[in-house]
Amino acid sequence: MITVDRVESTQDWNEFKAVTDLVYQGDPYRLPDEPMDLDRILISPPVAIASTRDIAAFLARENGVVVGRVVAIHDTSFTQYTGESIGFFGFYEAVDDHEVATGLLDAAAAWLAARGLGAMSGPFGPSMFYSAGIVVDDEPALPLVGMPHNPLYYAAHFEKWGLVGIKDFYSYLFDDPCVIYNRPEYARHMQIFEKIKARSEVTFRSMKYRTVRRDARIVRDLYNKTFVNFWGFSPLSFVELFELLKMMLPVLDRRLTLLAELDGKPVGFLMGIPDVNQAAAKAAHLKSRWLRDLVTLWHVKKPSRTDVIDGVRVDMLFVDPDCPDRAVSSLLIMELSVRMRDLGYTRVEAAPVLDDSPWMKGSVLTRMEQTPHRTYRIYNRDLELPRP
């Protein structure tokens, strides 16, 4: 018999975290630890974040054994900004049983509908800024750092329940970070970029640990200006961005975090994240969480890190739309690729990229014969509101 109950106690939360051990048992690409710190982003987030987001977590049990989980999310800041009556679900994990899936999704939908929300979208973890969608590729692979990983049957769970895919986004893999310029047909583009760089007054600097708060505010402002017209946008708060940066700092290489400035004013930002999952996979066999973290960080920080971590995820390309220099995005990409080459990285993956986003339409990806390496999907379903 399947039962679904709301998470209430510390023991419930411990069982919530343990669901992944059951779901991913035998998955060769599964990493033993959650990609996000659930305590900091879900269970006990900072007050400033908790005040803008109401959640209800649910556990599914079969004969007393936990077999699935889900979180219903009412992002009040999103509702207030967009005026849209949409709730979200996320952190979905379940065994391959449609009765379990139905029970979990029914519970999340009922909670959102009771709050007057007319649709449910997801999965988000807990918002689009952190993690969004599920992998829908037929070929499983080691997840890219910060991106989703899930059993392929999740799509069937969602679709059978009535969720419909509403947005796809992709990652693009380049086995050589300078492939854009090394291909003969792009030699001319490289010459153009060099000429633009020579006459451009745009300068670059890396984010600094001692000024991370100030730089976080700069990145927040650039994000909110850049993505204001993007699908699913709502303004990002400083607290939320800063919390994410704090979680990422141990694995970031600040030489790959670029701020572009023009006349002393910030006009762009681009971040490359070393694919720490490659190091985490090396430590996955260890039983102790702290030992896994220690070994992973050792691989991340050692001088010969690229022996294990040869890849970089390119994320967070923000350019001030009011910047008079229209070459900033190209210059940022070129500068990052040169730094990756000099540091010894030989693989780069750009993700997430919306296929219909303004950035995609204007980016160098549209001028390349490049097909998506991975596909992620977000789903939606209208809800029936309870009668008065």
Label every model-predicted segment.
Residues 2-3:
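Extreme N-terminal starter segment of soluble prokaryotic enzymes
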Residues 33-147, 251, 261-262, 266-279, ...:
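Conserved donor-binding loop and adjoining core beta-sheet/short helix segment
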Residues 81-167, 287-365:
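Acyl-donor binding region in acyl/amide transferases
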Residues 148-230:
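Acyltransferase donor/substrate-recognition loop-hinge adjacent to the catalytic core
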Residues 231, 256-261, 268-270, 278-284, ...:
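Extended hydrophobic-aromatic, low-complexity segments
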